[in-house]
Amino acid sequence: MPVNSTAVSWTSVTYITVEILIGLCAIVGNVLVIWVVKLNPSLQTTTFYFIVSLALADIAVGVLVMPLAIVISLGVTIHFYSCLFMTCLMLIFTHASIMSLLAIAVDRYLRVKLTVRYRRVTTQRRIWLALGLCWLVSFLVGLTPMFGWNMKLSSADENLTFLPCRFRSVMRMDYMVYFSFFLWILVPLVVMCAIYFDIFYIIRNRLSQSFSGSRETGAFYGREFKTAKSLLLVLFLFALCWLPLSIINCILYFDGQVPQTVLYLGILLSHANSMMNPIVYAYKIKKFKETYLLILKACVMCQPSKSMDPSTEQTSE
């Protein structure tokens, strides 16, 4: 979309300001998430390892993606492949988030489906393999345009390799719509919705059976129900934040027109998702809220770190 290169509009100034604020909140919030998991041995379980992976992706969004998005919004003239690599980095961490969410959903499904065998199935080695696979897939999907699926035009004029860096100047929209969105965002979202539907179905059946069984079994599935609701909310917020921008990309691909302000709002909403998860954890997971408060108290009151030792309260894996 044409943008005046001689001056930065108020829309751009507002966009950049909000990007910076969102980035700072995302970094601080997700560093706290990792800190909480580190402080609480009861949270150092399979699910929370994947939550840490999600937090790392969100930190990367704040540290790398948002500054790069600002550079791209300004249309700075750089080499084609430098611009392309910047846009690819932005995609990598989006897919790292969706892969982490998928891993979390699969883990919760195994937790309620294979209650007895769960610990034997989710070994430390398999957890690390799953984490590695999540990030490997994210890098492969995000870097695909670097291997040829891009807007590069063959030309003998070397000057044409430098251009104002804009997302659509280097990134092909058929890649964004069919490969990135349909295949690697929409399909995993549908799969995760099906997984959570099955999780709630299993929990409901087990809870109904627990009335005639042990109280311990009922308590276990009650905790699993609360945990599943919290993680489903995280998934819902991801879909709510990312689908508008994906729909905008579809409109642009099919030659539709989208006002620059609407495009900025879509980008900001997608980036805002990176700062939402820490808030959800604090609101829905008691152990997170307690440790957030302990960390805040330690920072404000300058108390020694030993005062932040977590309580021995049990937490669902």
From Swiss-Prot:
Receptor for adenosine. The activity of this receptor is mediated by G proteins which inhibits adenylyl cyclase. It comes from Ovis aries (Sheep). Most abundant in lung, spleen and pineal gland. Moderate expression in brain, kidney and testis. This is Adenosine receptor A3. It is a multi-pass membrane protein. Gene3D superfamilies: Rhodopsin 7-helix transmembrane proteins. The gene is ADORA3. Glycans are attached at residues 4, 159. PANTHER family: ADENOSINE RECEPTOR A3 (PTHR24246:SF2), OLFACTORY RECEPTOR AND ADENOSINE RECEPTOR (PTHR24246).
